[in-house]
Amino acid sequence: MKIDSRILPELQESFSQFPGFQLDNLEFSRGLLSNPPLEASKYVKITHRMISNAVGEMLVKIYEPIGRNRDKLPAMLWIHGGGYVMGHPIMDDVLCERFVQAANCVVVSVDYRLSPEHPYPAAIEDCYACLVWMKNEAEMLGIDVNRVAIAGASGGGGLTAALALMARDKGGPSIIFQMPLYPMLDNRNTTPSSYEITENHATWNRTNNITAWNMYLGEK
């Protein structure tokens, strides 16, 4: 199905220049999502930390208001998108900075393991480990453990929904709110839109979705 006619006119030029993700060339596609923002916010402090996961360590990025007092702030665990196979916290720096400024909160973004190198359940285990770390390090982070939200987009949205269930089932840290944005939830690829969006230059087409799910689920 031709999707160009359904794109807002002001976005047409950007869309026409985007090559589309090519999951048979992951190095290329991952490169599309690894560019740092042009300018960091002067109102938000960003800190890099390494925390433990099941296989060693992983990166988290902490975003907080510059000049904050020591009052405990609400917090959000942000899970970047990328179809479970791409992405890095750096791609959402601007978005996380906006969350901090809009909600006067602390945002923690986790660099979870990606498929196919690390298929399910690696990514969700990393997200859960980060959530537990936030609870355990609440004093250092200056956050209120009773006001911790989780959120993510695309594959990160799917992990957000999964994390809410995992935390519930494990009796883990309490979550006050979840925000899965256009989440990647259904591996069956039977919906009408799955058959409609097939063009190679589409941002995320049927072939990409099937390929990414196969990479993520592995032998599961």
PLM features: what roles do these ranges have?
Residues M1-P65:
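A glycine/proline-hinged amphipathic helix-loop "lid/cap" segment
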Residues K72-G82:
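Short beta-strand element of the alpha/beta-hydrolase
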Residues I90-V110:
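Short amphipathic alpha-helix adjacent to the substrate-entry channel of hydrolases
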Residues H118-M140:
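Alpha/beta-hydrolase active-site loop
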Residues K135-I150, K170:
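Gly/Ser-rich "nucleophile elbow"/oxyanion-hole loop immediately N-terminal to the catalytic nucleophile
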Residues I150-G152, L181:
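Short beta-strand immediately N-terminal to the catalytic nucleophile in serine-hydrolase-like folds
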Residues G152, G156, T160:
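Gly/Ala-rich beta-loop-alpha elbow adjacent to hydrolase catalytic centers
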Residues L165, D169-K220:
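Hydrolase active-site cap/lid region
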